[in-house]
Amino acid sequence: MNTLLNRSVICAVFLVQLSPALSAEPAATWPAVTLAPAREVTLSGPLGESLQRGVARLAKPPYSEPWLRADVSFEINRIFTNYSGDASGRFIELATLTSPPGRLSPPALAPLLKTVASFQKPDGHFGVAVDLSKPLPKNAPPIPMLWGNARLLVGLVTAGQQLHDEKLLAAARRLGDFYVDSADQLCSPAREADYRSSGTYGDGYTCCYFPAIEGLAMLYQATKDDRYLKQAERMAEFFTKFDCLPVDHSHGNLCAWRGILDLYEITGKQEYLDRAKAKWDAAVKGGFVWPLGGVGEHWYVCFSGDEGCSESDWLRFSLDLWRFTGQTRYLDIAERLLQNQYATNQCPNGGYGMAHIDCEAAGPVAAIEKVDEWPFCCSFHGPLGLHFLKGYLATGSERGVIVNFAYDFKAPVKAAGQDWLVSVCNKSGFIDGRNSKMEIELAPRDKATARGTLLVRMPGWASGAKVIDGSGEAVTAPVAGGYLRIEREFKAGDKVIVEFQNGLALEGRRFQKMQVTAGQVSRVKDVAVLAGPELLFASPVKGGGRPVLLATLDAAGKLGFPTSGNNLVTVVLPGSDASDAQIAQAVQFGRPVFLRTWPGIVASRHGDPAFVSVLEMGDIGKSTGVKPRRLPFMFDLVVVPASSLAADIAKLAARAKEPQADQAAPIFGTDLEKRPENWAVSQGWKFMPQGLLVSGGDIGLIDGEGYGDYRFEFELTIPKEGQGIAGWVVRAKDEDNCLMFQLQTADSTFKAPEFKTRPNTLRPHRRRNGQWEIAEPVALPKEIHKGEPHQVAVECRQGTVEVFLDGQQIYRQSKVDLRGGSVGFRASGPTEQGLFRAVSLKKL
């Protein structure tokens, strides 16, 4: 290692500009935009494949006609029928919009459309009979009914218009009349306290009532009946009393906001647009929008999962804000969402649901490779967002043809009085050393050639752009208002090639771009690493929290990792304050950590991940029985000059090329407490000259996989500062499935009968899927005290585990159901402390 590392500069970071999410191009003169007709747009590539899989999901179980209709007919017992019209309305909307021309698909759609209106109540609503004059506590019958009716109203209007079906539109009118007629009971300032009493989650008034703004606005556009518009505006005004961040249900909140933008489109009232822009800004600046580009199911800074419905709404909300303002920051966030969080939310069967997230107080830090399908909502709303996206890929205005995204698609566009066919081919390569390219063909529909203006969005992540024609000649393309402007003659077959310069970039949690200084060591915390619009995910990384990774910076200021190119490879460091020697040791001996974008994560899988489709309440939170990968995307980095690692990189690169590098070999040896790079470091672990002090962080394990039979041995001193308890782990399949033993000293003062604590004992534990099972304590053959060193050994052979204290066997267990797994230490907090020395692991 170069001694330059000694001259480290802690947190040598400064903000260089507001990110695309926070910087805005003025768009006071932004003209009206004509969206491409989504039905006529062909979307291919990965996004097109995701949409196709989502639509194909509609033809699979459980989506039979009775299952879908049950939330209005109650003919079968299934999950969430009290949300009357929710699943049926969503299915009707998506299936109608995506059915092939001249045919209704899937087969359940046609009979559902014929029968759904027959279950409408005389007052126009669907579902159980309700008395709206009664109080509305949480989950009162009218509340979930209102949610479902709002989704069904959208479905009925969509199907009525698309299919020119007057019976469906008549049913939509009757449902709209219900909202108008019930306004004095459901939209009354005098009942505000009553409404608030139900909270803001999916069983509360705030979540379930206001989404109908969208359906009422659509009904007005279909009928031009002012009553529906007035009711939607009345609800939008009343909504101001309830809107807030954080809020317990992002999907319900965003449905209301999309409806408010519909009102802006209809009325042109600036207040609606201003309110929507302010909401978006508050969410982004407040940390309620995650580095992944989307939001949580509960719209909090930190929550343990997202919801495909919410990601769809956030996408459409951002797209429409661009449509009405021209500010490309909204498209930058939409692209971030599509490339990251939207992709993580899709299940192997094509459905969408809740993707699990690992959080800390500041926000998410890692994706958990587990998605629970929610077939009652997200599996409709997820594909719906991608369907509407098609209309925004390329659009038209009086200024010309606007290309917003570098995806693979063909779209008919009308711009400045001319009909065009826009074809885009994506050639992006974000982390393999190539710049991102897109090939654009702009062909006039009614003539051989035509002069026109092509506007191509300049992504916020791009540091520059080069434009050439098909023969390689440079094309003039000045940048204004976030777009490259290309004016020329266009004809079928001619291509314009746009190449965006991109590299790795650092970004803070609130989308602020960050830089580190060349020629010195920088130590930065809580950052994401981006390749273009795509976050990098790290694997394999054990333990919780943000891992500390090693990064490099060359003399030109280019960010990288020890091994760059097609594969980004680095190592975990013992801490942000890692010394020169610790960095050198990690590079020489540490387990390779691969940094991949989400497509790379998918490619690295060994088969599809297990998932649960939630078809009944008991499925919520159900385990798949398979431990999912934890994939951090927020890191602490130690950034060193690239030249300082030149001598050590070859060893790391060689290890990264070894077969099964993602599944590291077992680690055996002595003095393992002196090799922090081989441990999944947890908070509360301190690697010191006198040993490894463990005083918190729950379980930490040694790296490696494929452990069989072994002898785990160490010298243990239980410090006087704690309460006389220290623990270690063997046969650890993972942190949630292992054997754990605790020693409690004779002078221990800790008393917790529920945990069977007892002085001067060994306490065996079994952790099964995260739950502790505690056996009866075993009395020690002699007294041990705090501050005394003792030799501990554990031998694991097949299904037998033996524990030795100072050479004497004190415990033996046979028929252990864990036949493999690594070793480690455990302390739940400072009351439990252990100082471990001479740690060894020997293969038997």
Regions found by a protein language model. Give the residues of each.
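Aromatic (Trp/Tyr) and acidic
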Residues: 25-107, 135-163, 206-227, 231, ...
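C-terminal beta-rich recognition modules with glycine/proline-rich loops and embedded aromatic residues
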Residues: 232, 276, 331-436, 479, ...
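Secretory/extracellular carbohydrate-interaction modules
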Residues: 696-766
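Short tryptophan-centered beta-strand motifs in secreted/extracellular beta-sheet-rich domains
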Residues: 712-714, 788-797, 801-803
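Short, aromatic/His-centered strand-loop micro-motif at the edge of beta-sheets
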Residues: 769-791
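Short, solvent-exposed beta-strand-to-loop segments that form ligand-recognition rims
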Residues: 805-822
